[in-house]
Amino acid sequence: MARNHSAPGGVVSPDRLRDLARLRRVRDRIDREYAQPLDVEALARGAHMSAGHLSRRFRAAYGESPYSYLMTRRIERAMALLRRGDLSVTEVCYTVGCSSLGTFTTRFTELVGMPPGAYRRTEAEATLGMPSCVAKQVTRPVRNREVSLTGRGVE
C-alpha cells in the first residue's frame, strides 16, 4: 500500500522531512566511513530503522540501494588510488574497505567497464598532469541507470 507523504497543497509532511533527514545522515555516513566495515544492517541500526525500511526508503530517495551507493563510493575512491599508481590492486581493494578482491574486481569492472589492473595501467597515463579534482570528475564511473537517463557515456 502506497502512502502519500505530502500534506495538502503539495507541502512535504513533517514525517517525510524526518525520514529524508535520516536518509541524508545515512548517505553522509557512507561518504565519510566508506572504508570501514559497513553493511545495511549497521547503517539501519544507526538510523533507527529496519534494514528493509532503510533499503526501500534509500532507493526511493536516491535511486539505488544503500549497498550500491556504498560500493560506488568505494569504487570512486579506488579509481583515484589506482590513478596514482603507487598501490597494487589488492592494496587498493582493502584500502577502500572491500574484504573480497573478487567482489571488488567484479563491481569495479561493472561500473568502470574494465578490470582495476587495466584501469590502473591506462588511466595513470591519461590523467598525468591533470589536477586530481578534474581527473576525479572526468573519470567518475557512470552507472547504467545514469546512462539511460542522461545519455552520458554514449558517443
What kind of region is each of these model predictions?
Residues M1-H53, A60-A61, S65, R77-E155:
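Alpha-helical bundle regulatory/interaction domains
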Residues S68-L70:
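Short, basic-rich loop-to-helix N-cap that marks the start of a DNA-contacting helix
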